[in-house]
């Protein structure tokens, strides 16, 4: 399908990038392969808006895939970064900023007794898995189809997100030996977890799950699912790892833990905690974290872990996220979900708007979506038409039907009105789309 609007400067940049970068991008979903057309190269962001290289402004409902919870270029975050940069960009030593950020995380997330800072969500989950194996002396890891935990080899099996976007069942380069200790189960199925423990007695080091998945679209845990995972892990000597890279500090002050109250053994964080910079963390029970080097035998390290600029940005952002901020984000999200649902209903488009706190996505099916298989049954071609209509009208959505939409405290009445104005035409485009 051809799209009538053009982005010549973005196209020129994409052509240049494609010569020197595989696929023209540094993260696959940015390439627009799932939706077609020219990926937009952004040059600036202010509040709820992005401006591309062609000078077009968009209401941003991606928020850098979650981190920009205060909107773009928040003055207090920018000031904190500028002050930190003025003192240097990296020292390779401990610094007060990393201590302060760790203290903030521990204060907000009650199950986290100690935390280790890293530079990406992938590093956080990779390190948490290694720590769980080292602590338990076991090898096997249970994960769920559709849950994405970064691009670490052992966790890419049935990983949702990028692999769902590109229709890949797995990825070349992950060996059978690497994936052999990974047990992949259907999401929201406690009986499958119980059966896995029975099939592998004394072998499972941990069960890892997105606290509330957002990488197959937003598919919240069924009532009692996370609590059931915790109980099964405790009964079988395994650790329960809650991946809050996406939900952490977004779905509440204490992330998804603040929503369901289930106490994990280990947790991973990223996105919001970095304030737009590469920063992430993993933490949890003190007795487990004590196994990390240099205190214990499980090795983990990183040259830029605890970077002073990243920790300054993250700390500034977290300190601005009070109860009022979350109330605002939740209200904006609820309003947008209602507007989207009304527009699609008016045009007779089968859909399900699924939310986890202020994260949400739209599945183009009217059937319940409880797991990865359900998510894949939607009419993705309708999302493609919807996406391009919104983009042409100045609303930037995730370029994939399998990703969460995000809002920020900066999404004001004007931004919401612009989204509302774009929805009728986008809903008609979805209704008229053909496979």
From Swiss-Prot:
Transmembrane segments: none
Keyword hit for Isomerase: yes
SUPFAM superfamilies: PLP-dependent transferases (SSF53383)
Pathway note: Porphyrin-containing compound metabolism; protoporphyrin-IX biosynthesis; 5-aminolevulinate from L-glutamyl-tRNA(Glu): step 2/2
Chief location category: cytoplasm
Highest taxon of the lineage: Bacteria
InterPro entries: 4pyrrol_synth_GluAld_NH2Trfase (IPR004639), Aminotrans_3 (IPR005814), Aminotrans_3_PPA_site (IPR049704), PyrdxlP-dep_Trfase (IPR015424), PyrdxlP-dep_Trfase_major (IPR015421), PyrdxlP-dep_Trfase_small (IPR015422)
Keywords of this entry: Cytoplasm, Isomerase, Porphyrin biosynthesis, Pyridoxal phosphate
Pfam families in the record: Aminotran_3 (PF00202)
Reaction catalysis annotation: (S)-4-amino-5-oxopentanoate = 5-aminolevulinate
Example GO biological process: protoporphyrinogen IX biosynthetic process
GO molecular function: glutamate-1-semialdehyde 2,1-aminomutase activity; pyridoxal phosphate binding; transaminase activity
Listed PANTHER family: GLUTAMATE-1-SEMIALDEHYDE 2,1-AMINOMUTASE, GLUTAMATE-1-SEMIALDEHYDE 2,1-AMINOMUTASE 1, CHLOROPLASTIC-RELATED
HAMAP family: HemL_aminotrans_3
Subunit structure: Homodimer.
Protein's name according to its UniProt entry: Glutamate-1-semialdehyde 2,1-aminomutase
Organism: Streptomyces griseus subsp. griseus (strain JCM 4626 / CBS 651.72 / NBRC 13350 / KCC S-0626 / ISP 5235)
This protein's encoding gene: hemL
């Amino acid at each position: 399908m051809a799209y009538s609007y053009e982005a010549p400067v973005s196209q020129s940049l994409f052509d240049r990038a494609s010569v020197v970068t595989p696929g023209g991008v540094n993260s696959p979903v940015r390439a627009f392969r799932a939706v077609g057309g020219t990926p937009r190269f952004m040059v600036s962001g202010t509040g709820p808006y992005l401006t591309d290289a062609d000078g077009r402004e968009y209401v941003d409902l991606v928020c850098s895939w979650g981190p920009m919870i205060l909107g773009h270029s928040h003055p207090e975050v920018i000031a904190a970064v500028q002050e930190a940069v003025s003192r240097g960009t990296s020292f390779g030593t401990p610094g007060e900023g990393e201590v302060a950020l760790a203290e903030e995380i521990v204060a907000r997330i009650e199950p986290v007794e100690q935390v280790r800072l890293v530079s990406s969500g992938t590093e956080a989950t990779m390190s948490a898995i290694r720590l769980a194996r080292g602590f338990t002396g076991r090898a096997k890891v249970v994960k769920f189809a559709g849950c994405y935990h970064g691009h670490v080899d052992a966790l890419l099996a049935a990983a949702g997100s990028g692999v769902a976007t590109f229709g890949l069942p797995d990825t070349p380069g992950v060996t059978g030996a690497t994936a052999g200790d990974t047990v992949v189960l259907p999401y929201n199925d406690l009986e499958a977890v119980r059966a896995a423990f029975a099939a592998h007695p004394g072998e499972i080091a941990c069960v890892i799950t997105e606290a509330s998945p957002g990488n197959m679209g937003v598919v919240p845990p069924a009532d009692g699912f996370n609590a059931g995972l915790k109980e099964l892990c405790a009964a079988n000597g395994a650790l329960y790892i809650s991946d809050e890279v996406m939900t952490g500090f977004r779905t509440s002050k204490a992330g998804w833990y603040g929503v369901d109250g289930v106490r994990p053994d280990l947790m991973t964080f990223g996105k919001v905690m970095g304030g737009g910079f590469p920063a992430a963390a993993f933490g949890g029970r003190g007795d487990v974290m004590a196994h990390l080097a240099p205190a214990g035998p499980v090795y983990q390290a990183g040259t830029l872990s605890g970077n002073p600029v990243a920790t300054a940005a993250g700390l500034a952002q977290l300190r601005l996220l009070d109860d009022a901020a979350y109330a605002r984000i939740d209200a904006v999200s609820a309003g947008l979900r209602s507007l989207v649902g009304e527009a699609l209903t008016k045009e007779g488009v089968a859909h399900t708007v699924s939310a986890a706190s202020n994260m949400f996505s739209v599945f183009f099916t009217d059937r319940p979506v409880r797991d990865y298989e359900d998510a894949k049954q939607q009419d993705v071609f309708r999302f493609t038409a919807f996406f391009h209509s919104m983009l042409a009208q100045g609303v930037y959505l995730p370029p994939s039907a399998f990703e969460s939409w995000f809002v920020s405290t900066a999404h004001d009445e004007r931004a919401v009105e612009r989204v509302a104005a774009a929805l009728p035409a986008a809903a008609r485009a979805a209704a008229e789309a053909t496979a």
